[in-house]
Structure formats: structure tokens, C-alpha cells
Amino acid sequence: MTALLDTFVSKIIENSDYAELDATYLSNRILALVGEDNAQQDTNQSNLIALKDELVDLAVVNGKVGDLAEEKDCLGAELMNFITPIPSQVNKAFWDTNAKSPQKAIKDFYELSKRNNYIKVTAIAKNIAFTTSSVYGDIDITINLSKPEKDPKAIAAAKLAKTSNYPKCQLCMENEGYQGRINYPARANHRIIRMNLGDEKWGFQYSPYAYFNEHCIFLNTEHVPMVISQNTFRQLLDIVDIFPGYFAGSNSDLPIVGGSILSHNHYQGGRHIFPMEIAELDSVFRFKDFPDVTAGIVKWPMSVIRLRGANKYSLVELAEIIRLAWRNYSDDTMNILAFTGDTPHHTVTPIARKRDGQFELDIVLRDNHTTAEYPDGVYHPHIDVQHIKKENIGLIEVMGLAILPPRLKKELAEVEKYVLNQYNEMADYHKDWADAIKASHPETSSETVSEIVKQAVGRTFVRVLEDAGVYKRNRQGQAAFMRFVESIGVK
């Protein structure tokens, strides 16, 4: 056993630029935050984040912070800020190291973001993840449990909290070092790497609740809305040049087919191989005037044109030609509608990579028009699969990684009981699906039911992606896809 405060101070010195001479100063600053009573109580913890959690709990007892998770997070971030260098130092270290080894610069910043608990490693470990097979290859499924559900008391407190427009959104630069409040996340330990993309100033940070390895965000330093343009393709390819081993992609810039934040232009990236990346090409061709670019249609439930070549300027120019062609392309025979009046329905979800010295750009065609039959969107998960996924299909899911809601953890356990003919409290909206599982697997046992239900979830998610695909994976749909490609001009 060691004394809590002393142990935490020792860990700060071990993980920062502070020295032993600073120990008294650090102790006093921490006491000011958590209170003096029982600060030297015994602890058997040696992990920095676990020690931080004990100090936060002590602060609650001492009346220095409220008991709501949001209040404790604000204090926790402030305590972890002791091991986090100031932004200018973080940026200098990153770019100094980057000049010698980009890989090491990325690794160092990633490790800092985990060490200071900005990336919620413990929370992320709660996610349920598994892989299911499909005709398109393996599909990755996750049930997202990392973000804690809101406490009713916190919801009530947030309603009473003073409204604020600062920061404007959670992707703004003003989040760096922000204290946080009952209705806004703590960011005292948050750091952003400054960078240039062309003539624009951008930032690079990690996602606190990562969905995959080294999940990061690239954000415009100005609060400007999402827009897909030729500049988007240029910037994505620049990113994969600057960050070796990372992909970079953008959500679409229209509702229904876009991401959850359309108000602030940003991209996502990371060090992860998604199922779509390794999917085969159904066909290979070249576009006129672009002999240095190989193109093809990807064997994937969504409609993807893959461009590949060593000259990124050619890829940027061709991608913009495809985007503009798609923006104005309609096909009544396939229920593909570019405009309703002056309202545009067509955009793309672009993803960039660099592999073996070649640049790759996947252009995923998107259509957000609605009808009386499909009020949520013709190319949105249809009603019969919304019991599994009803939210927008964004960048990450387009690539074959399902991010399913936390409710499914309990709900799928009840489905398993139903399939086994046991007492259950299964939600009614799963019944047709669960009946189909029972009918196709009469031999199900307690040993096999979990895997059977997981595979059924995977098949349903594939259907979700097929619903979001503009050109369906049948002969008629693929012929129509080639008509669009040929309208641009192929050799």
C-alpha cells in the first residue's frame, strides 16, 4: 500500500516533464482540486488512470465535485492535464519528430492521447465486436457500449444548465483545453496537431471513443459546413501522403446519407483495414483521357468506383468528373433521382489510401431522395431491418464496419432465449427476424445459439448496406451502373 496523493504525483513526474523538485507544487495543485481530507489514504493502485479515478471519487466525498459522471469527467480531465504538455509543446514535438520519422511522430501522439485518457481505452474495451462472413467477404460488427448512457439526473441538470454557443461544436479548435460542463464534454487534456492541407489550416486529433485502431479526425480550423468538392479529394490524398499507413475518408455532405455532424467540415482516418478495402473488383476499365488511372467497380453491397494510380493529380481530376456527373445523373428506370426542384439528392462518400506507392480513391455513390413508400430514404435501411440499424449509414459503415446501438446487447440476449423457446422479454420488433432464425436453425442449442444470432446480425447488416446501395447487386442494377460509368466515357 502507498499513499494516494504521493503515488499520483510520482506517476505525473514519471509521465511528464515535471521533476522531483515540483512534487510539493503538484501536491498542492491536486489538493486544491480534490480537497485535503483523506488525500493520503492508502491505495494499492499503480496505474495512472486508476489513481485518477480514486482521486475523483475522493473529490466527490470531499464535496469538491458533484456525483454526476459528467461532473467527474471534467475533474478527471483536469487531473490528466498534469501529464499533458501544452499545445505548443505537443505540436513542436510532433513536427520535429515527423521530420525524421512520420511513423514515430504519429505513434508518440497516439500514445500520449491514450496515456492521458483522452482516448477512453477502458470504455472502448466494453464494445462487443465480432466478424461474420458474407458473399462480399468478412463483415465487421460492433455493438457500441463505450459511451455511457445519460443518467436521468444528468439529463435534468442539462436542461437547467445555461445555454452556451462556446465552443460552437465538438469539432471546433476551441475545444482544446476546454473545461467542459454538464452538457458538454470535458476537454482539458485534449490536444490538436496543427497542419496545412493546401492553403487551408487544419487540425489532427484522435477520437476519444474510437471505433477502430488509431481512429482519428482531421478538422478544418474554421467552423465551416461539410462540403464534398474537388478540394476534398485533393486533401484526402494529401493526408494519406502525410500519414503513412492511414486511410482518410469523408462522410457525405447531405442529410440521410451523411454523418452526424454536417456543420463542421472534417474527415476521419486511422490505421485499420476495412472489409471494403480488400473486396475484389467486379470489373476493370479505364476512363478516357486518364490512361494512368486504373478504375473498376468494387464487389460490394454499395455502389463503389475505385480509382488507382501513382499520380494523385489525375485521381483528383477524375474523381471530380465522376462527382459532377453523378450530381446531375438521373435514371428513372432505377429510381435514381438527382434533383427534386432545386434540391440536390446526389453526392459521394470518398475514401483515400496509399498502398505500395499507389494512391487509391474509392468513390461511393449516394442518393438521399425519399418517397411515400420510403419516407426515411429510398437508399436508407428499410423498415424491415431497422430493428437492427435505423441510423444513417456513414463513412465507417459504408466500409463494412457496423456500429450498432447499445440496446442490442440486452435485446439479442432475449432473442437467443426466444430461439431456444425459453422465457424471454424479446422486443416485438425482433419477432419476424427471430422466427426466421428459428425456422432456418431448428437444431439450435444453448452452445450454438449465440453464434447463430451473431451471424444473423451480420446478414442483416449486409442487407442494410444493400439497401443503401444505389445500384443493386443484380444483373439489371449492375448494367445500370455501367451505363452511368459509360456516360462519363470509358475506353
Swiss-Prot record:
Pathway: Carbohydrate metabolism; galactose metabolism. Its EC number is 2.7.7.12. It is found in: Cytoplasm. Its main location: cytoplasm. Keywords: Carbohydrate metabolism, Cytoplasm, Galactose metabolism, Nucleotidyltransferase, Transferase. It is an enzyme of class 2 (transferase). It catalyses: alpha-D-galactose 1-phosphate + UDP-alpha-D-glucose = alpha-D-glucose 1-phosphate + UDP-alpha-D-galactose. GO terms for cellular component: cytoplasm. Pfam families: GalP_UDP_tr_C, GalP_UDP_transf. GO terms for biological process: galactose metabolic process. One of its GO terms (molecular function) is UDP-glucose:hexose-1-phosphate uridylyltransferase activity. PANTHER family: DUF4922 DOMAIN-CONTAINING PROTEIN, GALACTOSE-1-PHOSPHATE URIDYLYLTRANSFERASE. Belongs to the galactose-1-phosphate uridylyltransferase type 2 family. This is Galactose-1-phosphate uridylyltransferase. It comes from Streptococcus mutans serotype c (strain ATCC 700610 / UA159). The lineage of its organism: Bacteria, Bacillati, Bacillota, Bacilli, Lactobacillales. The gene is galT.
